[in-house]
Amino acid sequence: MKILMLTWEYPPRIVGGIARVVHDLSKRLIKDGHEVTVITYKEGNVPYYENDKGVEVYRVDNYMINPNNFIDWIMQLNFNMLAKANELIDKKGKFDVIHAHDWLVTYSAKTLKNSYGIPIVSTIHATEAGRNSGIHDEGQRYVNDTEWLLTYE
């Protein structure tokens, strides 16, 4: 099976637990005979592409047009992830499944699903309501609603 992992963090970029989960899951899936491609954010002096013991890792820039607004930053990242996924599909063919890791990649995952008919598996590693003991402001409501949108797909 050809699996596309979408995540905003993958080693060496580790923000929380997502990077470790995606890394370990990808390695296990390779061991089980699957093809795994990861598209993630490029931070610092890391290559745009690497083969991490069988896991093909593609990193994309984020141009940070408005770095003070995290939601805008995430949307820009989703556009760049989507562009890279489209490029890979054009070159290598369609993926069998997309595994979207958390709300941060919702829009690229949803667009790929709708454009190519690729099913989505989604993992919300920590819900917004759980992290904050409820939803208390509009920013949290936006993240909560985006989590719902991803898991509804």
Give residue spans per PLM region.
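A short, charged, and often flexible helix/loop element on the N-terminal side
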Residues: 55-86, 138-139
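Short beta-strand scaffold positions
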Residues: 99-100, 151
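A short, histidine- and acid-enriched strand-loop-helix "catalytic/donor-clamping" loop
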Residues: 123-140
